[in-house]
Amino acid sequence: MENEYRLRFFEEEGLKRKRCKVCGSYFWTKGEHEVCGDSPCQEYEFFDVPTKVKLSLRDAKREFIKFFEEKGHVPVEPRPVVARWRDDLFLTIASIVVFQPHVTKGLVPPPANPLVIVQPCIRLEDIDNVGLTLGRHMTGFHMGGHHAFNYPDNWVYWKEETVKLAYEFFTERIGIPEELLNFKESWWEGGGNAGPSFEVTVAGLELATLVFMQYDVVEENGQKKYVPMKLKVVDTGYGIERIAWFTQKTPTAFHAVYGELLHEFHKRLGVEEPPDELLYELVRSAGLMDPERPETLERVYKRASEKLGMRVDEIREIHSRASLVYQVLDHTRTLMWMLADGIVPSNVGEGYLARLVIRRTLRALKKLKADVPLSELLELQINYWKDDYPRAWKNKDYILDVVEFEQKKFEETLKKGRNIVIRLIKKKKQITLDDLVELYDSHGIPPDIVSEIAKEMGVRVEVPHNFYSIVASRHQKTVHKVKGAEEKGKLPPEIIEWAKGFPPTRRLFHEDPYMKEFDAQVIGSNRNYVILDKTAFYPEGGGQAADTGVIASGDESYRVVDVQKVGDVIVHVLDRDYSGGKVVVGRIDWERRYRLMRHHTGTHLLLGALRKVLGDHVWQAGAEKTPEKARFDFTHHKPLTREEVRKIEEVANKVIDERRKIRAFTLPRNEAEARYWFSIYQGGVPMSKDIRLVEIEGWDVEACFGTHLSNTGEVGSLKIISTRKIQDGVVRVEFVAGTRVAEEAAKMEDLIREASEKLSTNPEMLVKRIDALQKELENVKKTVAEYRKRLVSEYLKAAKALDGIKYVKLDLRDPELVQEVLRALSSDSPAAVIVDGRVELAAPKGVDVGKAVREVVREVGCKGGGKGNRATVVCESEEKVVELLSKLAAKLTSQPSGRRG
């Protein structure tokens, strides 16, 4: 392995290979020191290291880009923090994620080669350490990356050049003395790839990692195997926040990153800023702090106490409160990024991670007893960073609204949560880590709240320091794919395998979506499955139903009942086995197809209207287009109001009236993303070099496989027929378009007319008639309640007792009356209410009527059961009822806790 790290550059520059006397890792340096320069092997001593420049975060980003641009790299715009192009990640955790898997797998060329990018990233694995380690850990950070993609026929650069670039950047541009720079040997694995790497460290602080991605990691017979990649990738990650901190030498990284905003947060949260000398003393040992081992913190406090003459408990309190301020500062910027890029907090996916950050921030505010709305702090962040993150400024209204909504929701959760925790403790007598995770996942109850409630009940709960990291790690990854016929199971496995052997089918439905009839050659048939050289039949996909119609060969006609896509091959499913010739005529069921086209184009129109009315956070979560109607699921934090529905319809129909042009065209993926951004990927991200786009002029552009109209006027009109929240953070809209609007209107007219006739009024007076009936009903309810009250009193007077069980027979089948009588009768002893052989039983708490019933019911010849102090039994005769009550009385008397009146 040593050869992987022995470079000509090191020899030429005089760097020697050493072994760290603390951790045993090998590193390369010009210096005489014996440690690798990383923490915890070395404390943070970079405060004493001189530099040429003093860089703000903005300056550090600019200098990084400028340096590598001068070295021949093309700057690339940063991508969203939501990794919607990945099917295994929710968040962008590194700059290389931007190019995985489409570029790193060789499917798509990079946007430039070599390139440089400063990418906002979010990692939640160490969320519990944020604040406590004074800037060593952050949930949100900028990763500077210079990347080179080395193809067999286009080699760019590799280890020698990468290390030289890093060396020059840190020594020449930043001005770090050469003898203090270390290149620590390491090994990197992630995302199915691996390779050797160097960690660039200086005086305790890691400033960059240089990864040489050269292996695919595969598993064979349970053994990990490294297979050389054809495409070798230079994957570097420079900590831009750390570079800013390194050059500014501020007491914490938060001071370097947030500047005046840090002071404002201290003021708003009512927390006095710690003295700089204390922070400097604590931060030097930040690399030694392991919050999962409290004794490491205590050692740091004790040392600071001895040096500064302060009490340990005083230092602990100051550090704890300042840490919470830094945590809130970090989390609110991370939230700003998440929400600005369209995440809607929910209980699944990336929405779950956003909610986790929100709720952890709210708990920090609670611990500080800070009476400050979270939205107020988000607004400070948005205003402070508006020039750096214009998407946050643009989506400010949504960000503040959703945060206020989430804060209210969390407060309601805490009110309900107490009883949930109490019930669980009574049932289990203890709370495990799995219980804590379940309580948080399913009910949103934070672990510290659980611990407080448990303590009141005399139960001790161990809450791991890294609880939120554990929870986040369970929700960091996903698998969401646009399914083809292979995954949908619409075709038998043997047909899928058979279809893979044919060349791609020419797509006439894309060349001319209005083609109703076509000639084609049969190039394969297998039972009732047929493959043509070209087809106008649209295969199911993108939420659009498959076409149906007829395939004719000579005098024979076959119904096309389904069409599926296997890769680039289109399979036609017929109503019977095919026995025709090689030449066929295909005829589309045009009326059905045209309705599908109207609904598909209508869906694109609707999405544009939703984003216009509700905001850019609206993102497709699912869609289905059928001839009858279309369904569109989208991300949004609240159910739609009637006013919003009307506005959405109005906006969509205005675009229909404007008869805007619609065109479908193909662009190279990189060009499509650069021109239209990532909102084109509403229905998933195709892993292809070229992207087919559908554009509604001046309104909407999406990557889409479906068939569309030529202008919006052909949609006719659009009417939303239903909206509902289908899950946390997802709203479903169903709508109809074209002639279906008139059909739906006729259906509603019939319903209104029928209702009017039944209520003996005309449609215009229907609402008034219903209002009048509601008032009548309320009066009737009041009258019934009064009579019921009198009846309860009468029945209580008529009650009898049988061996300690009170009972009464009712001659009215009124469930509410039965329950009211039973409640009153069983307040101090077991009781029964009998209605037509049905016996409802109840008793005071502590009396197990259910158990007694289960023991005697068969013996008596009745049927029934119960649980706790309630039961229901059905008997065929009055004699059996009497026998039942008598035997129950005996059983209840023998119960240890049985009570009788």
Swiss-Prot record:
Gene Ontology cellular-component annotations: cytoplasm
Q: Which domain of life is it from?
A: Archaea
The answer on whether this UniProt entry bears the keyword Nucleus reads: no
- List, alphabetically, the Pfam families matched: tRNA-synt_2c, tRNA_SAD
- Entry keywords, A to Z: Aminoacyl-tRNA synthetase, ATP-binding, Cytoplasm, Ligase, Metal-binding, Nucleotide-binding, Protein biosynthesis, RNA-binding, tRNA-binding, Zinc
Q: Where in the cell is it found?
A: Cytoplasm
* EC number of this enzyme: 6.1.1.7
Q: Which residues bind Zn(2+)?
A: H600, H604, C704, H708
Q: Name one GO biological process term.
A: alanyl-tRNA aminoacylation
Q: What does this protein do?
A: Catalyzes the attachment of alanine to tRNA(Ala) in a two-step reaction: alanine is first activated by ATP to form Ala-AMP and then transferred to the acceptor end of tRNA(Ala). Also edits incorrectly charged Ser-tRNA(Ala) and Gly-tRNA(Ala) via its editing domain.
**Domain notes from UniProt:** Consists of three domains; the N-terminal catalytic domain, the editing domain and the C-terminal C-Ala domain. The editing domain removes incorrectly charged amino acids, while the C-Ala domain, along with tRNA(Ala), serves as a bridge to cooperatively bring together the editing and aminoacylation centers thus stimulating deacylation of misacylated tRNAs.
Name the record gives this protein: Alanine--tRNA ligase
Instruction: Report the source organism.
Output: Ignicoccus hospitalis (strain KIN4/I / DSM 18386 / JCM 14125)
> Which gene specifies this protein's sequence?
alaS
